């Protein structure tokens, strides 16, 4: 018979294992995406097609019992994937896309770290019980700082004043990071609706492709509009 203390140890061990798996997955995926975005455009196309296919597959597995919800996925998933591929076709956008992914990765990572460190009030307990307001603030501000740090990399260049100015860059990055968290909650709504925790298990420590890339659902269109109108 496992005692309450024993159960707590098992939970902690599982959490540590997940963190290690997340780190290992990141060590593989992040460099792969950096290479694809900055130096190998065909690889980026392949990666995005694989991501889109994985997201659609997991969405189908989650929502096949509801035609209206299934159709929603056929709209909200192909659009951001297509926009990212479209933006990447122009060589001058490579640092914009690199910056975008750095923001998405940063807000997820630091929101998790901030939530575990500072704890506090839950952000949306019914949709995502682990998310906290402290995690949201930590993630958004950290993503803004990471974006500014990325802008100091040699050869970094975006042909847009607002993305080149450090103050505007910080503000824009925080806005994208905030929308990324809303995008996460948007997908969490459907996961709760269909009573699933993770959309899949293909990415160790992260769950499914949809779990890892849900932030692009709402943010890519905003990035595209910023690129056009700013």
From Swiss-Prot:
Protein name, as recorded: Phosphatidate cytidylyltransferase
Pfam families (alphabetical): CTP_transf_1
Name of the top EC class for this enzyme: transferase
Gene from which this protein is expressed: cdsA
Residues spanning the membrane: 33-53, 67-87, 95-115, 133-153, 167-187, 206-226
KW Flavoprotein (keyword) present: no
Membrane topology recorded in Swiss-Prot or TrEMBL: Multi-pass membrane protein
Keywords: Cell membrane, Lipid biosynthesis, Lipid metabolism, Membrane, Nucleotidyltransferase, Phospholipid biosynthesis, Phospholipid metabolism, Transferase, Transmembrane, Transmembrane helix
Species: Rickettsia conorii (strain ATCC VR-613 / Malish 7)
E.C. numbers: 2.7.7.41
One function term, GO molecular function aspect: phosphatidate cytidylyltransferase activity
Pathway participation: Phospholipid metabolism; CDP-diacylglycerol biosynthesis; CDP-diacylglycerol from sn-glycerol 3-phosphate: step 3/3
Subcellular location: Cell membrane
Record-level GO cellular component terms: plasma membrane
Recorded catalytic activity of this chain's protein: a 1,2-diacyl-sn-glycero-3-phosphate + CTP + H(+) = a CDP-1,2-diacyl-sn-glycerol + diphosphate
Family: Belongs to the CDS family.
Superkingdom classification of source: Bacteria
């Amino acid at each position: 018979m496992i005692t309450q203390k024993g159960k707590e140890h098992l939970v902690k061990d599982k959490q540590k294992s997940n963190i290690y798996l997340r780190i290992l997955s990141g060590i593989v995926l992040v460099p792969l995406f950096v290479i694809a975005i900055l130096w190998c455009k065909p690889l980026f196309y392949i990666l995005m097609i694989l991501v889109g296919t994985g997201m659609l597959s997991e969405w189908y597995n989650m929502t096949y019992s509801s035609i209206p919800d299934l159709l929603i996925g056929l709209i909200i998933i192909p659009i951001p994937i297509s926009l990212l591929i479209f933006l990447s076709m122009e060589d001058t956008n490579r640092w914009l896309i690199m910056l975008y992914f750095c923001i998405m990765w940063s807000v997820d990572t630091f929101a998790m770290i901030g939530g575990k460190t500072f704890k506090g009030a839950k952000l949306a307990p019914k949709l995502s019980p682990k998310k906290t307001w402290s995690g949201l603030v930590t993630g958004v501000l950290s993503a803004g700082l990471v974006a500014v740090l990325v802008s100091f990399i040699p050869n970094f260049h975006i042909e847009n004043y607002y993305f080149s100015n450090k103050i505007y860059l910080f503000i824009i990055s925080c806005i994208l990071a905030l929308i990324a968290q809303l995008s996460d909650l948007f997908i969490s709504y459907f996961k709760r609706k269909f009573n699933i925790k993770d959309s899949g298990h293909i990415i160790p420590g992260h769950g499914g492709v949809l779990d890892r890339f849900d932030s692009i659902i709402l943010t890519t269109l905003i990035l595209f509009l910023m690129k056009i109108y700013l």
